Amino acid sequence: MQYRTFGKLDFRPSALGFGAMRLPVLVGPDGKPDFKQIDYPQATAMLRGAIDRGVNYVDTAYMYHEETCEAWVAEALKDGYRERVKVADKMPVWKVEKPGDFDRLLATQLERLQTDCIEFYLLHSLDAAHWKCVVEHGQLAAAEKALADGRIAHLGFSFHGTYDLFEEILAATDLWEFCQIQLNYMDEDYSAGRRGLELAAGKELGVIVMEPIRGGMLARNLPPQVEAVWAEAPVSRTPAEWALQWVWNIPEVSFLLSGMSTMQHVEEDLEYAARSRPGLLVDDELALVARVRDLYRELSPIPCTACRYCMPCPQGVAIPDILALYNDAHMFGDVSRQRFFYTWLDEAERADQCTACGECEDKCPQGIAVSGWMEKAQAFLAG
């Protein structure tokens, strides 16, 4: 296993962190996967196998597997494994609605994890709405109290908003010691992106990368054009490894999280991590990745560059997010996943709120007929 630096902290994390969001589950009475029923034997074997091979960071959250993941982590880390890793957990900031909620939720997490202290604690999934919850309900003050009395050791946040919001959150407090952002070779300019990574690293925060394979989309159902480019590579790598090595190649990345769901995934990711290092990919290989990125973008039906000139929408429609979901569904052929993400948008932000006022179309540098695409996106994504 390779180990890397983590901001200013005296902790060297494994290049690969164990993300516990996509664990193997049992089948319910209806014959469908029951995401609340983690397959304890298989999932535990996966985690312990990863730790035996050097993984030393385990990431969970209050909401994962319908609030059953934290309890599984506690059980899986028995028999001496707890002492060999750091555990990260996350505050569901949207559930904090009144004084005392933060402490109550944290107490529940400590109980589920069977611990007195969570080493790495994140405010979960910060975007504009969730950051508003943090500010309005004094969650930073509550977190500072938890740091002071030892219920948590280090504070960070995971992020799903715009770059400007990322800047604002970083500047809001000196309590941050690390953050978690989405980054992969398709998303250099999305959300916090590469700029956010460099900004946070410049402030000596540890930076964890999530979604390095875009939820698996960069590793499966590859278009023939993409397969042909990978076949040209002088070094043979799977599409998943290309995606992971692209992230590990960046010196500012502390480590990445992989949401592994089978023992095969664990074995493969451990193998990839063992040969990872910053600067591993040479210029010709990075150019190959760029060609793949360009091919995927050519497959997207809407020429949106996520410049966000269309925002804010007078009706509150999340225009760039909706266009991205529509494009992703067509680029990667994973329609059900994008429809699921569409449900995460507030109803007031969805495409059916568009009134075709045309204000966004006047601002769009690409000349996109946004109102027409909103109608198509609503019909397609609302399913």
Residue ranges and their predicted role:
Residues 57-63, 153-157, 180-181, 255-257:
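Short catalytic-loop micro-motif centered on adjacent basic/acidic residues
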Residues 6, 18, 50, 58, ...:
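Conserved, mostly hydrophobic/aromatic
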